[in-house]
Amino acid sequence: MVKQVTPVYDWDPETGVSTCIIMRNGKTHIGIAKCRPEDRDMMGEKTGCTIAEMRAELDYLRSIRDDEIKPKLEAYKTLYYSINQSNRFNPDSYETHMLLHKIEQTAADLDLVKSMIKNSQEDLHTYMKQKAETWKKIRKHREEDKTN
């Protein structure tokens, strides 16, 4: 079971770097967001920490995929291949059916995590795009105010 832990944030207004640290299942996942030089006029703690947290969550999902689900699926497939090569292999046995079920279930888990990673990446991209559009409008209004 995943124990929810409050993320730890760090914001450095001098450098424009935000960091988010998430500890889950004994592993540390870090997300970093660095403000681009051309956006320093719009730099903010909330935006930086939000982006850093989204990146830390992505790191967590990738670790689940790469460190847990993929090795488990590979082990199940290797086991099935090994028993399939045996002279005593019985495709109708309870154990064979359970192993095939575990392979299917783990493959479905892998597909789910891949989908979650894709959705999280899209959410991050959308968030950053919306922020860029907002900043563009604010800059435009500031320019208009200066000329008036």
Task: Indicate residue ranges for each PLM-predicted region.
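Positively charged, aromatic-enriched nucleic acid-contacting surfaces
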Residues: 9-49, 59
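C-terminal charged interaction modules
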Residues: 93-148
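A generic, well-ordered mixed alpha/beta core segment in the N-terminal half of proteins
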Residues: 5-7
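Intrinsically disordered, low-complexity charged/polar segments
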Residues: 61-105, 109-112, 116
